[in-house]
A protein has these predicted regions:
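Domain-edge interaction signal
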Residues: 1-166
Length: 166
């Protein structure tokens, strides 16, 4: 168990883990924004602690972490081939615990090959924390406990599926 990270640190860890897959995975800004959010959600659902220090906002196309958006928007819709986002000062690599890496790898293996548009649809479908928060505006904060509750429910679904198939 460790302290929460900045969204930038989590994004850089996802980039690093993605590159180490066979074949390597590279992500567009939209994918990366959603993967960080999903990893934050699963961490809340499984460990009951946040993965990132920042709050998540409900934007038109789903949940967004504004600081991370500022770092990735320059890539447009292209894949990010850089090894790291940010600069020397804000991209210092963080220590990730075994549990955190396990969750990040699960998220990459489960969602990493899904394109940004589909990930966006998944994260702002009805019944999601985004849909409960978004009100035709920008920047409403999605309450962390709402995200935690949503991913706890998903976790229960996964667990009951495992029970019925084994």
């Amino acid at each position: 168990y460790s302290m929460a990270h900045t969204a930038l640190q989590v994004a850089n860890r996802i980039i690093e883990l993605g590159r180490s897959k066979h074949p390597p995975q590279y992500y567009t800004p939209m994918q990366l924004l959603k993967l960080v959010y999903i990893a934050h959600g699963w961490t809340l659902g499984i460990c009951a602690t946040p993965l990132i220090t920042e709050q998540v906002e409900a934007w038109k196309y789903g949940p967004v972490i504004p600081d991370l958006y500022q770092h990735v928007k320059k890539y447009g819709s292209s894949s990010i081939f850089d090894e790291k986002l940010g600069n020397f000062w804000n991209s210092q690599s963080a220590e990730f615990s075994k549990d955190e890496d396990a969750i990040l790898n699960y998220v990459i293996d489960t969602y990493g090959s899904i394109d940004g548009i589909q990930l966006s649809q998944i994260t702002h479908a009805s019944g999601t924390p985004w849909s409960a928060t978004f009100r035709n505006g920008w920047g409403d904060v999605i309450p962390t406990d709402l995200i935690a509750h949503h991913y706890r429910q998903l976790l229960e679904k996964v667990r009951s599926n495992v029970r019925t198939t084994t």
